[in-house]
Amino acid sequence: PDNQAIIIVGDVDVNHIENKIKELFSGIKVPANAAKIEPVEVADNDTAIYVIDKDKEQQYDIFNIFMKHPAIPNAMKGDMSYLMKGYMDNVVTSMLGARYAEIAQEADCPFLQAGADDGDFLLSSTKGAFSLIGVAKPGKVKEAYAAVLCEAKRMHDFGFTATEYQRAMEEFLSQVEKTLANKDKMKNEQFTTQYVD
């Protein structure tokens, strides 16, 4: 019980809900021999680790590439540097996503779509990952993989143009304004997700 939490969002009677939680859960005690909960460190690796699998229900060839990095410590979450990192991650993945969308318009592009993200490494709390995802055209998995990775390498080596940044920043600000304008229409699960993260 000491490694669990209850998150309640919505228009509720705080005193009533707090008393109900205490009534239901205050009697639960931590067992004397409870296992110690410790985060499991995810090791770094010098060479690629890959898995290839098939799913007869999956119509497309999809690939994910994870580039691990240290996770953001919980103590830093909520401060200004964390918010700035979130902004930078959003803008970088948006700019790279725009490049992938533009490339996908070319007739000889080997992928149907591609994108990038930066967040948790699978279920790990000790590692984050910059990740790329691609959906290959039929029979073009190797070419699609190479094209997606090549554009990410180009981003790493040469960065972005001022025009790309301006467009991404304007999109970000537009999203923020839209969220603010609709703040009274946010669903409870949106708040819950933010609290869990």
Q: Where do the language-model regions lie?
A:
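Long, His/Glu/Asp-enriched segments that create or flank divalent metal/ion-associated functional microenvironments
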Residues: F63, K85, D89-T93
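Long, highly charged amphipathic alpha-helices
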Residues: H16-E23, V91, M95, E143-C150
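Short C-terminal domain-edge/linker segments immediately following a structured domain
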Residues: K36-V42, Y82, S94-R99, A162-R167
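An aromatic/glycine/proline-enriched structural segment found at the starts
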Residues: A5-F63, E170, S174-L180
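Short linear motifs at secondary-structure transitions and domain/linker junctions
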Residues: F25-G27, I37-A43, P70, M88-V91, ...
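M16 family metallopeptidases and their MPP-like homologs
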Residues: D2-V9, Q59-M80, Y100-D197
